[in-house]
Design a protein with these regions (language model features):
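Histidine- and acidic-residue-rich, metal-dependent catalytic cores
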Residues: 1-209
Length: 209
């Protein structure tokens, strides 16, 4: 469906940016982009009534939805053009480092590097996208939720993701907690939620970090 196509392109793009931030080789960056494009291809085997259900999935529907990563893997694993690393990244993109993910429930040491990056990108894009069953979160709220998932997401992938994000571009206008509007004049590495701003009314400089 249209959402899955857009989501896959978004996840591929975000994953490649994170991979570059981590210093991966050009070939690894390309491969993780392929992972992003293919990670949800198995959803073509899930009924649209489940994919776009406006309410909460029941247990049987959720069990079927959880099969999509296995379906994706099975659709590409015998294709010569896709490396084992790409196939494993697709299979494991819903695994969590504490073993609470699926389809295999493996923990950090058994999750491939591509999947660790894909997981962060997949969750972020899902959070900021409106779906029939939920509203979209703001980028800031989504980043804060990502930052809270230290027991589930790989720390290195998470840090690289955060370092590559620019939530408040220079010259953008924000509203401060005191109600004053301010212009962003500088972003601070590692503190993406707290830029340096100048109040439009007061002229005061606020270092929100």
């Amino acid at each position: 469906d249209e959402y899955t196509f857009k989501h896959s392109v978004d996840v591929a793009t975000i994953s490649m940016i994170v991979a570059k931030q981590q210093g991966l080789s050009p070939e690894e960056v390309r491969e993780i982009g392929v992972c992003g494009l293919l990670h949800d291809i198995g959803k073509t085997k899930i009924p649209n009534a489940i994919l776009n259900k406006p309410g909460k999935l029941d247990d049987d529907e959720f069990a079927l939805m959880r099969q999509h990563s296995t379906y994706s893997y099975n659709m590409i694993k015998d294709r010569a053009e896709f490396s084992p690393a790409v196939c494993l990244g697709v299979l494991q993109h819903h695994e969590k480092i504490n073993g609470s993910g699926y389809p295999m429930g493996v923990s950090a040491e058994k999750i491939c590097p591509y999947a660790k990056i894909l997981s962060v990108a997949d969750i972020y894009d899902a959070l900021v996208t409106e779906r029939p069953y939920k509203k979209a979160y703001s980028q800031r709220d989504a980043v804060e939720m990502i930052m809270s998932m230290t027991m589930e997401l790989d720390i290195t992938a998470m840090k690289s993701f955060l370092e590559s994000m620019i939530l408040y571009p220079v010259d953008s206008i924000v509203e401060l907690s005191n109600g004053e509007q301010a212009r962003v004049v500088k972003n601070i590495p590692h503190y993406i939620l707290r830029p340096v701003v100048v109040g439009l009314t007061s002229g005061n400089v606020y270092n929100l970090g």
